[in-house]
């Protein structure tokens, strides 16, 4: 009986860990005035204790032909699991926000392209791990191609 209980708890933990991911939205989606000037907001999903999530973000881009990586500040909103990303990169150039997160043993990642009018939801990519350098480069290339059309 004890083994069955331990196995059930392990399966629940595994199911939650495998489902850890991000969902992005406009600042209005946070329903918090603190996010009003944000570039976008995101929510963690599949984390049993969202307040204990560890989140980081970088702006990955090309500026005047030179590759840049800038650390961004991620602001936690009052509601656990909701975060805002504010503009922390130059207006010129091609930029993608690289989100990384952990919740217990689970990891999540996302690449959020930034266009002239803000984040591009339909071109965003989500991963069950941090994005690789190759995925970042591919997304930057796609963003450049999108801008030339």
Name what the model sees in each region.
Residues 1, 17-18:
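Absolute protein N-terminus
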Residues 1-8:
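Sec-dependent signal peptide recognition
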Residues 9-17:
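Hydrophobic h-region of N-terminal signal peptides that target proteins for export
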Residues 18-149:
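N-terminal soluble domains immediately following signal/targeting peptides that reside
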């Amino acid at each position: 009986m004890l083994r069955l209980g331990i196995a059930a708890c392990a399966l629940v933990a595994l199911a939650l860990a495998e489902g850890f991911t991000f969902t992005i939205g406009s600042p209005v989606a946070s329903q918090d005035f603190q996010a009003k000037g944000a570039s976008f907001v995101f929510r963690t999903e599949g984390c049993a204790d969202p307040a204990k999530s560890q989140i980081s973000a970088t702006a990955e881009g090309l500026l005047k032909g030179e590759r840049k990586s800038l650390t961004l500040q991620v602001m936690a909103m009052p509601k656990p699991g909701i975060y805002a990303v504010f503009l922390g990169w130059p207006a010129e150039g091609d930029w993608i926000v690289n989100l990384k997160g952990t919740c217990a043993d689970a990891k999540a990642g996302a690449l959020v392209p930034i266009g002239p009018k803000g984040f591009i939801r339909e071109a965003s990519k989500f991963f069950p791990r941090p994005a690789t350098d190759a995925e970042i480069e591919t997304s930057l290339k796609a963003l450049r191609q999108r801008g030339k059309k």
